[in-house]
Every structure is written in C-alpha cells, then in structure tokens.
Regions:
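Acidic, Mg2+-coordinating active-site environments of NTP-dependent enzymes
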Residues: 2-100, 106-130
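Hydrophobic beta-strand segments of well-ordered beta-sheets in folded domains
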Residues: 41-44, 67-68, 182-185, 207-211
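Nucleotide phosphate-binding/pyrophosphate-handling subdomain across enzymes
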Residues: 1-10, 15-18, 92-208
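A short acidic, often aromatic-flanked loop/helix-cap motif at beta-alpha or helix-coil junctions
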Residues: 74-80, 149-151, 217-219
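Alpha-helix N-cap/helix-start motif
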Residues: 23, 54, 109, 169, ...
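C-terminal helical cap/extension that packs against the catalytic core
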Residues: 49-69, 153-160, 166, 199-228
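Flexible, gly/pro- and Lys/Arg-enriched active-site loops
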Residues: 15, 19-24, 148, 213-226
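A general structural detector for well-ordered alpha-helical segments in enzyme core domains, enriched
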Residues: 33, 172, 198, 225-226
Length: 228
C-alpha cells in the first residue's frame, strides 16, 4: 500500500490473471495479493465469477477488521422480467434507469459503487440515478461512434473491449448472446494470456474471427502463432 489510511476499498471481480507476477500462480495467489494488505477501513466486495471464489475472498478478509459489505449479503441488484433494475441495501430500495454502458455484468459494478456512495458519502438517490446514465467507461464494451476505426467499419456497429482474462471472455460472450445481429470478432492478445480458454468462450457465437498483430508491442502474440 502507498497510503497510511484510506476511506474505503472496492474489490472488483477476481479471476485468473497476472500469474507472471505471482509466486503462487493460482486463483488463491491472486486472491491473496488482492486482499492480504488492505487497510482497515470500509471494504465493498463485488459479485464474483462463482461462489467458490466468493467464499475464498471472504475467508481471506476474515482477519481484516474493516467494515465489510458483500454483494448478495449487504447489497444486491437485479433486473426484473419487465426490465426494471432494482437495487437494494439496508438503506432502502432503488428503481434505477437503464445505464448508458453496455453489458448486464456492469450492473454488478454499478451496485458496488452505489453501495459505497450511499454508505460512505450519503449520495442522494436522484444523483445516483442521474450518475448511472452518464458513465464514461473506456475500453469495456465501448461503442466507437467516430474516428478512424469507425470510418473503416462504415455502417457496421463497432464495439471494443480490452478484456484479456477468462472472466472477461465470459462477459463479452454473454453480451454477444444478447445481440440480434451477426457479430464478427477481431482479436489481438499478449503472449502471457490463456489464448485457447479465452477464445473457447466464443465457439458457436460469432460469424467470423479475425486475428491481428498488436503493432509496436514485443509482448504481443503474433497472429500466426495465435492461429496455431
């Protein structure tokens, strides 16, 4: 930690990633690195990929004396059959407008932010509703509406995502499943990622896959090696 004290910590989705920096190259090692040195304050924990990881995160935080708020226990969010988005915590219920970012997985990120903003900053409900319609999130299912790439894409819809681990491939795949148009995937990755597992998420979901090189990046996997 670079701070002696903090107001709060938000823990996002933890999954297999950045093993090259870890001595324990497993999900347990990732969880340890992300939770073992958190300062004592307030910790808000997002929904995890599965219950097993969620339990491991909770166990890893047992010795931390912070106030802890877990998705599914202390706050929750869901989309009803009539598409209403409902948020709940011990302060009360909120019916939320549709966010201006793509992907239902973002509802979990939004819920963690709402929990923190209500508990720590006492943000008003109307400001929360306004805020989730004005989110600026770069490189996460971000629709590109202008610029050089959009000119190349023409009338096609262009969406970019910088996801590079298995959990992000699940997220992208789930979003693709919700689309009514054919999806063509263009992919470039670094050498140290789980390429086969990442790509397996898109089997049977996309119209085509195009592998490209990452320009001026020594750590990128070449398109020829990727295809093999």
């Amino acid at each position: 930690n670079v701070f002696k004290k903090n107001l709060m910590t938000l823990i996002g989705v933890i999954h297999n990633d950045h093993f090259q920096w870890l001595e324990n190259k497993s999900i347990d090692g990732v969880i340890h690195e992300k939770t073992c040195k958190l300062l004592n304050s307030n910790i808000f924990i997002n929904k995890q990929v599965n219950d097993e990881i969620g339990k491991k995160v909770e166990e890893s935080l047992n010795q931390n004396t912070s106030n802890k708020y877990f998705f599914g226990k202390n706050f929750n969010i869901s989309r009803s059959d009539n598409s209403f988005i409902q948020y709940q915590d011990d302060i009360g219920e909120l019916i939320l407008p549709e966010p201006n970012i793509l992907g239902d997985h973002q509802l979990y990120n939004i819920s963690t932010s709402i929990a923190a903003s209500r508990k720590i900053f006492n943000v008003k409900d109307q400001d929360i509703k306004s805020g989730i319609q004005n989110i600026s999130l770069k490189g996460r299912l971000q629709e590109i509406k202008s610029g050089k790439l959009k000119k190349i894409a023409g009338n096609n819809r262009l969406v970019v995502d910088g996801g590079h681990n298995i959990s992000s491939s699940y997220v992208i795949a789930n979003w693709i499943k919700s689309q009514t148009q054919k999806v063509n995937l263009v992919v470039a990755m670094m050498k140290d990622k789980e390429h086969q597992k990442f790509m397996k998420s898109f089997e049977g979901l996309v119209n085509s896959v195009t592998i490209i090189d990452i320009p001026n990046q020594d750590g990128g996997i070449s398109k020829n090696e990727f295809k093999e």
